[in-house]
Amino acid sequence: MNATIRTIAAVAAFIILTTAAQAQTAGIRGVVVDDTNEEPLIGANIYIEQLRQGDAAGSNGEFAFSGLAAGTYTAIVSYMGYHTRTEKITLREGETRRIKIRLEAESKSLGEVVVTAKGEARILREQAMPISVISMNQLSGTVNSIVDVLNKTVGVTLRSSGGVGGATRLSVRGLEGKRIGFFIEETPLNDNTDFIDINDIPIDMIDRIEVYKGVVPAKFGGSAMGGAVNIVLKEYPDRYADASYAVESFNTHKIQTVVKRNIKEKGIVFGVGGGYTYSDNDYVMELSHLNNIKVKRNHDKYKKLLLGGSLKAKKWWFDEVEFEPVFVGTYRDIQGIETDIREAFIKSRAYILANTLKKDNFLIEGLDLDMSTSVAYTDYNLVDTAKQWYDWNGNAYPSVSPYGGELGNRYASDARNKKFTILNKLNLEYLIGKQHTINFNSYFAFADGYPKDDMRELSIGKKAVFDSKMRSWTGGLTYDFRSGDDRFLNSLTARYYLYTMNTRSASIFGLGDKDVNLNKSDFGINDALRYRFMPDLMGKLSAGYDVRIPSETELLGDGYTISPSEALLPERNTSVNIGMLYDLTGKKPSNLQIEINGFFMYLQNMIRYTKGIIGAQYQNFGEMRTIGVEAEVKADITHWLYGYANATFQDLRDARRYEENSSVPNPTKGLRMPNIPYLLANAGLEFHTENIFGGKGQNTRIFADISFVEEYFYDFEMAAGQRRIPRSTTIDLGFEHSFFNNSLFISGKIKNLTDARVLSEFNRPLPGRSFGIKIRYVLK
């Protein structure tokens, strides 16, 4: 750790000593907006002729050029669906000009109807459902992980079980796990979360992260319920290379790189990228179930390799044809908490090939096609063959089975679970004039599983895992209406769910096995509306009845510690959200945003992971009611200081009248649901400036974040002395400094500055104070 501190100090000294000429340089800062409603245009291109240099507008339409000499510059600003505009900008020595560039939307004739093109920023901000957008400016170059960024988002928490590579579950307004959709470029990844974690996506490749709360757009496909996270990747310049290396506490190392090339004359874009992560995760943890003794994690090594490529053609019959091969390889030791696990580990590999086809005016005028197909082969290997297990005092005990085993019930395992998956998502959008849009979405999932565990069969004396076939289809139809003056927007969606499964199952400790043949369907509907009271003030109201299909693991278990539960029913959620948004982004220097939302949810057939005396199982828990409120304010306090603050109160209560499958009154009715935080808050400040040490082409960011989670219960609050997960307050500090007009970045971060004790769900200890430093180079 001392070496890490010395490294950070050396980098800070390097930044201070790296100064160029002391001449007073000029700069340009501005925003690009739609000329009719002042909405910022995310991703608009700004090109300075004299510099032969360009930039892309950020999430608020902002852009900046620094370190300029006095003189006159020509800025060419363009955006898809808008007329290109040229601006002459004259700078005096030492002057930073602030400008607003308004682009006029193009119009396309569809017969007798005129359809005005809409930019991506307008589509996002004008949606009727609650959505938080995290821009590339909050991501690029920093030591932050995606988890760090999402944890600061109002209404969102990340439930981690340990350090780097530990299981991470996203929670939105208290709903978590497979209820929350995980998407990359609107492609569902929930079926592959055993192989691709939300933190695996190289953060420097991300343009923005969209967090949907409550109603999830049907165009995403799948059966997400209660919320979704969609990661949108960057669009790169014609020539681009990006490489970074980060070193963090607990012997953690991260390497990420991407290379892109655009051959415009042939309409071909290709690239490769990837990342490698290694960590020992050897932090000291405090075991609350053993009188708070402190032990160093000794079996939590983690390695992951992620490689990907892309070939995109823009001059074939389709507007865009893309092929993307991906490989993900993971190795993870299994760290013990209740006992000292020393040998068990997991290896997994995933091979994925994805194809995307896009075509505007497909077959008929006004009909846009977007179809993606992916084929995946995955191999998941759990090895647990230790002949004895240990307690935390170092005492050894023989395994239950002569074949070994130290996990769960301590029966040996050498599982090889292979799966072949095909996913297809079809999105058809038809524009009917300026005010009406119809969208049809179809999402097919085919999964054939081939598990094998000869060691387990020898250990327990029977076959426990079987081949399976699972098919599901979700169809969605959405009708959008937008008033002529753009004050009112309504989005009505209906969904149909169908799933089938064919396999066999056997109780872990019972005799015999049986056929499992499921064929079920369901229906959901939701509506969301938005009304502009003033150009800067809008109200949102949404309500929905959504359904989530049980996953394969929930239905079939894992043949080891999780028993089958093929009788599981789909979850059903009734939700209402009402909110207000006051937004001055791009209209006032403060870029002030104030948002408040109230929400209600009633979840039926809640699927819950429950541990028993022998093994565990997913069960339909019954009913749960949620009432909550969230609020956020963020603004540029000055031209060099940005601040934000948010708070979430989410009251999740057991709503069952009776114990499951009985007439016995439920003793926990009305009690708060355990293991779910109910009061959270975040706040932060960011100082940013140009050429703080003189010279030119340098930018500096220094930030501080504080997060608070109130104490909550480990189990239902039945007695005053029950175990609780304690209140936690953590502070993070960090910096980022860039050189040569954002070509070289050096950043550092201290997480959990005060070394506060932090426990996650089920009292799992999380890392204390840690350090990280990162260097990144961009060639464009």
Task: Report each predicted region and the residues it spans.
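Extracytoplasmic beta-strand/coil segments of soluble accessory domains associated
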Residues: I131, V147-P188
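N-terminal periplasmic accessory domains that precede
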Residues: R97-R102, I146-V149, G166-S171, F183, ...
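Gram-negative outer-membrane beta-barrel transporters
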Residues: Q593, G598-Y602, N620-F713
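Periplasmic-side early beta-strands and strand-to-turn transitions of outer-membrane beta-barrels
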Residues: D238, A246, I263-A344
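Face-selective signature of the C-terminal outer-membrane beta-barrel domain
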Residues: K314-G329, S348-G510, K514-N526, R530-M538, ...
